[in-house]
């Protein structure tokens, strides 16, 4: 097996949408980095039955909607 080809694996702090924090090991960032989640299991529609509204942090959702607003898939 080749040496030094894998990313560094270290502890990072994960902050969920409700402010809950926990430590986990990850290749994200550097030792002690903080990963702020936009969507987590408590707010994701797949785990909440679709009742939660998605928050548009960073404007990604609105940018997608404006870019593809005129697109239709055969429905009129």
UniProtKB/Swiss-Prot annotation:
Family matches, as Pfam families? Ribosomal_L31 (PF01197)
For this UniProt entry, the molecular function terms from Gene Ontology, in alphabetical order, are:
rRNA binding; structural constituent of ribosome
* Any one GO biological process: translation
Recorded superkingdom = Bacteria
Q: Which GO terms describe its cellular component?
A: ribonucleoprotein complex; ribosome
The record's SUPFAM superfamilies line, in alphabetical order, gives: L28p-like
Identify the keywords attached in UniProt to this record, alphabetized.
Answer: Ribonucleoprotein, Ribosomal protein, RNA-binding, rRNA-binding
Q: Which InterPro entries match?
A: Ribosomal_bL28/bL31-like_sf (IPR034704), Ribosomal_bL31 (IPR002150), Ribosomal_bL31_A (IPR027491), Ribosomal_bL31_sf (IPR042105)
Known PROSITE patterns for this protein? RIBOSOMAL_L31
Q: What NCBIfam families does the database record attribute to this sequence?
A: L31, PRK00528.1
**What is this protein's function?**
Binds the 23S rRNA.
Its family remark reads: Belongs to the bacterial ribosomal protein bL31 family. Type A subfamily.
SUBUNIT field: Part of the 50S ribosomal subunit.
| Name of the molecule in the record | Large ribosomal subunit protein bL31
User: From what organism does this protein derive?
Assistant: Methylocella silvestris (strain DSM 15510 / CIP 108128 / LMG 27833 / NCIMB 13906 / BL2)
Tell me the name of the encoding gene: rpmE
